[in-house]
Each structure stands twice: as C-alpha cells, then as structure tokens.
Amino acid sequence: MSVEEYFNLYKKCVDIWSIQFSLEDFKRFQKSRNIKIEKEKNCIAILSLTDREVEIYFIGVAESLRGRGLGKKFLKNIINFSKYYGADFITLEVGINNIPAKNMYSSFNFIECGIRKNYYRNSSGSREDAIIMKLNLN
C-alpha cells in the first residue's frame, strides 16, 4: 500500500479527537524504524515501537463503518501484535469527552494513568484534555 493510500484511509477515519497528521507526516512515518502503520480493511493505526512499549498514536475506523465492532477487533489485533513484539505495556491518549473510545479501551483493561491538559483542539477551536491510558501486558 502506498503512503498516499495510507493517508487517504487515515482521512476517512479521523475525527474531532484525533491529532491531525499530514501527508508529509506519513512519509516520515514510513521511513522511521520506530513507527509502524497498521492497516486492516477500513481501520488504520499508527504505533510507536520502543524497547518494551507500544504507544498508539492513532487508531481509527472509517466513519461509515463505526459501531460494528471493527475497532474492538482491530484493537485486539494490536494488543496481540504488541505481545508478539515483546512489549510490556501499551499507552495511548484519548479525548476526555470521547466516551465511546474510553469505554472501548476500558473494556480491554486499559487504565487511566494521567491527563494532558488542553491536548486536543476540536473542530470548533476549543481545547480538550486528553486522558493517558495504559494496558499492562505482563
């Protein structure tokens, strides 16, 4: 899959809580040894891989397909990949008002472990805190 195809899928999945990445960001991601772009049908994730940690920078499902359990299935695959990779834990940030995503992460035993004040800018331009969540894999 080309970097442009990854980017176009990302644009279908992005929502008001997402960090906005550009095509140039995706080109840098493809060259990085520590960044992995995972794709599964109409889902995409951007992961940072370090010694014993996987950080989910972005995970999304195409808007037209949300509410069908695809995000849960994809997250389960990311967790399995992280275990195979040898990670001890997974971290991510989620908007404080993104209740569906917070509930999904909690259902996989992610726990809240911090807050990033004014981390996201939503479509109206106002700021929103992000909750840092962590899943221990051991």
Model-derived regions, located:
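Conserved hydrophobic beta-strand within the GNAT/NAT acetyltransferase core sheet
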Residues: 56, 90-94
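Active-site acidic-Proline motif in GNAT/NAT acetyltransferases
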Residues: 62-68, 96-97
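Terminal substrate-recognition subdomain of acyl/acetyltransferases
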Residues: 125-138
